Amino acid sequence: MINANFLADTDPLVAEIIQKEYGRQQDHLELIASENFTSPAVMAAQGSVLTNKYAEGLPSKRYYGGCEFIDEVEQIAIDRAKQLFGAAHANVQPHAGAQANLAVFLTLLKPGDTIMGMDLSHGGHLTHGSPVNISGKWFKAHHYGVNKETEAIDYDQVLELAKKHKPKLLICGYSAYSQIINFEKFRAIADEVGAYLLADIAHIAGLVATGHHPNPVPHCDVVTTTTHKTLRGPRGGLILTRDSELGKKLDKSVFPGTQGGPLEHVIAAKAVAFGEALKPEFKTYSGQVIENAAALATQLQERKLKIVSGGTENHVMLVDLRSVSMTGKKADKLMSGVNITANKNTVPFDPESPFVTSGLRLGSPAMTSRGMKATEFIEIGDIIAERLQNPEDEGIAQKCRERVASLCKAFPLYPHMMAKVPSLV
């Protein structure tokens, strides 16, 4: 492989920025729920010579020559994905979760058809019918939300809305929802109104793969996911189905329907990540992700901060900052000031705009990857509460920074890279 000094010799400006980003990741508590730290093996595959190869088509059905080894690695990724999720068919080529969803829409829908997913402000996703996304521009989008009292999905309301709007595609799976999803109930609702059912499990895929969350594959027509987040792979997408014939149509919607050449270096990294996820250690990791999230949520509640829906059953939680008379925008800035990376987020029935919000989204996957356990997440919860409840006290801010620094030092990111190097790839 390429010597670590090569990038610094060729482009010292970019090398320096990469080094700075490594320093930022090392010195911050990463609590953005959609982020994680991949293994060095995943990064090595992604930085390999496979980036040089065009490979339009599928294994053994390529439009370019010289794909014999590309075919092998992509088939490994396909086989491992199918094994992980119990699927009959997998397409590992989508560049991202949004592209995976677009391919599903192209397969199952025509412009003007009706779709129904969760409202973005309640925890849904842009690609589930938001008016600013192609899914909301090409299709008639309707949305369901959570119950105002429980802040959890009201399946009776979903059924009522589905009967009213008669969607051709019903979507479940969310970007900021902390409770278990009942895919069996969604299947029953879809069947009652004659809809296809899509589960977008981008956030919970790693938990599903290890049995820590119910598997949607037996119940849904199609399942999409990203390959990073809780799955801890490279940034990319994945499509799964239990229907092999439908799988063939989905393949055509990926290529040539919505993409050209696949990113085979990323697919190799997906194969590595799927292999890691099949190991017992990854199941232990996923269980720890859930335990750590619960510890964080409980500590925040003990410090009198409100958690949407009363807690978390997965890796993510929303702090309703109206309990401390603060906006998400302000909280995001306060967290950044003590080297905690999180993101402002709308909460259900939020009176603030998406650019301001009343919530802060937190997640446990990344810092769990660095080896932290419940004890550390209790400490993190205490730091967060201390800062949010004393926003004007710079003395407390400094103490919070010191506590963050101590945690980061105790759980280094990529210890083999701790020495200052010009390139991390």
Curated annotation (Swiss-Prot):
Stored CDD domains: SHMT (cd00378)
GO BP of this protein: glycine biosynthetic process from serine; tetrahydrofolate interconversion
Catalytic activity annotation: (6R)-5,10-methylene-5,6,7,8-tetrahydrofolate + glycine + H2O = (6S)-5,6,7,8-tetrahydrofolate + L-serine
Binding site for (6S)-5,6,7,8-tetrahydrofolate: 120, 124-126, 245, 353-355
Keyword terms, alphabetized: Amino-acid biosynthesis, Cytoplasm, One-carbon metabolism, Pyridoxal phosphate, Transferase
InterPro entries per the UniProt record, alphabetical: PyrdxlP-dep_Trfase, PyrdxlP-dep_Trfase_major, PyrdxlP-dep_Trfase_small, Ser_HO-MeTrfase, Ser_HO-MeTrfase-like, Ser_HO-MeTrfase_PLP_BS, SHMT-like_dom
Pfam families tied to this protein: SHMT
Enzyme Commission numbers on file: 2.1.2.1
Site (Plays an important role in substrate specificity): 228
Cofactor: pyridoxal 5'-phosphate
Compartment(s): Cytoplasm
Signal peptide extent: none
Pathway(s) this gene product operates in, as recorded in its UniProt entry: One-carbon metabolism; tetrahydrofolate interconversion; Amino-acid biosynthesis; glycine biosynthesis; glycine from L-serine: step 1/1
List of residues that carry N6-(pyridoxal phosphate)lysine: 229
Top-level enzyme category: transferase
One cellular-component annotation, GO: cytosol
One term of GO molecular function: glycine hydroxymethyltransferase activity
Subunit structure: Homodimer.
Main function: Catalyzes the reversible interconversion of serine and glycine with tetrahydrofolate (THF) serving as the one-carbon carrier. This reaction serves as the major source of one-carbon groups required for the biosynthesis of purines, thymidylate, methionine, and other important biomolecules. Also exhibits THF-independent aldolase activity toward beta-hydroxyamino acids, producing glycine and aldehydes, via a retro-aldol mechanism.
Family statement: Belongs to the SHMT family.
Protein name, entry field: Serine hydroxymethyltransferase
Organism of this sequence: Trichodesmium erythraeum (strain IMS101)
Lineage: Bacteria, Bacillati, Cyanobacteriota, Cyanophyceae, Oscillatoriophycideae
